[in-house]
Amino acid sequence: MSTLPIRTVFFISDGTGITAETLGHSLLAQFPEARIRQVRAPFIDDLDKAIDCANQIREAARNDGVRPIVFSTLVSPETVEALHKADALFLDLFDRFIGPLETELGQRSTHTVGRFHGIADSLDYKNRIEAINFAMAHDDGVSSDGELAEADVILVGVSRSGKTPTSLYLAMQFGVKAANYPLIPEDFERNKLPGELHNYRGKLFGLTIAPERLSQIRQERRPNSRYASLDNCKYEIDAAQKLMRRENIRWLDSTTKSIEEISATILQSVRLNRPGY
């Protein structure tokens, strides 16, 4: 059992905190033995909120007996200064990079609060909403031939192999219109793709998964059923992989991959150059 003290880690932002939390998690993942208690502090966009947050940091330091770690993407010098007065390891993610960028680009930063994630009126936001609606409307094979023409990518694989969450993540994070289609026993018996997919081979990407993991997931949904049995899962996975090889479909084993890794692989494979939001 670890004897390391518990450290409180704050993710502080004047916006949603997504950037601070994402980068913070990436860095902390390099220290698997660290004992961490996480505190999210979004929308710290004025001095009063910053002072309250600084007091929380001081309280955490007293309770833990060690100073907290702060990942910050605050822009306002006033709020940054207030937080610097607290006893913490303060990792200012914007300050670390804004200066070199100003020098390289030959211009001053706007230092505008909420600049990146404040996109409610932008085209990017509209595209994301449309992509989310598309993913929900074209889940689990609910698509007509004409509608599939609008898809940026069509995910295929056996039931519960991760198609739906991946489709939604691609939509929410990248504005990608992703449909998904289940491969079912009838497809394996015919040893061919569903007819409606034939015209869209270039958009197809397959997901597979270890049979043991698939059986575990299916048992949660339909315990003690043939659908969830390990033998059936082995059969379906083997048949799906053979079908994808025969049809020359690119595919990925999702068993040990995060949804972020799966999505990045799909974007690269189908050559969708989309910025993340």
From Swiss-Prot:
EC number: 2.7.11.33, 2.7.4.28
Matches recorded under Pfam families: Kinase-PPPase
InterPro entries recorded: Kinase-pyrophosphorylase, PSRP
Enzyme class: transferase
Key words of the record: Kinase, Nucleotide-binding, Serine/threonine-protein kinase, Transferase
Reactions the enzyme catalyzes: [pyruvate, water dikinase] + ADP = [pyruvate, water dikinase]-phosphate + AMP + H(+); [pyruvate, water dikinase]-phosphate + phosphate + H(+) = [pyruvate, water dikinase] + diphosphate
An MF annotation (GO) of this entry: ATP binding
Chain residues that bind ADP: G157, V158, S159, R160, S161, G162, K163, T164
Protein's job: Bifunctional serine/threonine kinase and phosphorylase involved in the regulation of the phosphoenolpyruvate synthase (PEPS) by catalyzing its phosphorylation/dephosphorylation.
NCBIfam families, sorted: PRK05339.1 (NF003742)
UniProt record similarity statement: Belongs to the pyruvate, phosphate/water dikinase regulatory protein family. PSRP subfamily.
HAMAP family according to UniProt: PSRP (MF_01062)
Protein name, per record: Putative phosphoenolpyruvate synthase regulatory protein
Species assigned in the record: Azoarcus sp. (strain BH72)
Record lineage: Bacteria, Pseudomonadati, Pseudomonadota, Betaproteobacteria, Rhodocyclales
